[in-house]
Amino acid sequence: MDKKDFKDEKLLYNVRETAAVLGVNVNMVYELIKRKLLPALKLGSLKVRKTVLIEFTEKYEGMDLSDLDNIKEI
């Protein structure tokens, strides 16, 4: 990957962007991070790596996450 490609590639998403990608509200993203279901890092504000979002959606595909105390298959 050359420098031009790297600059055009978004690697980190803030909480608002993460919520938009996942189609949930920001409170759900904060809760997923708090419960360590969605790994994040803090660089000024909380950020989620693009690869983490992909892994998260693959890991929880077919699961109902609407109640984080009772995650189950759909």
Task: Walk through the language-model features, giving the residues of each.
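Short secondary-structure transition/capping segments
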Residues: L41, V52-L53
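Compositionally biased, disordered extreme N-termini, encompassing classical targeting presequences
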Residues: M1-F6, L68, K72
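Short, surface-exposed beta-strand-loop junctions and turns on beta-sheet-rich folds
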Residues: L46-K47, E55
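Major-groove DNA-recognition helix of helix-turn-helix-type DNA-binding domains
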Residues: V21-L46
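Generic structural "secondary-structure junction" signal
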Residues: N14, L43, D67-N70
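Polyanion-binding surface elements
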Residues: K3-M28
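A short, Lys/Arg-enriched interface patch at domain edges and termini
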Residues: L53-I74
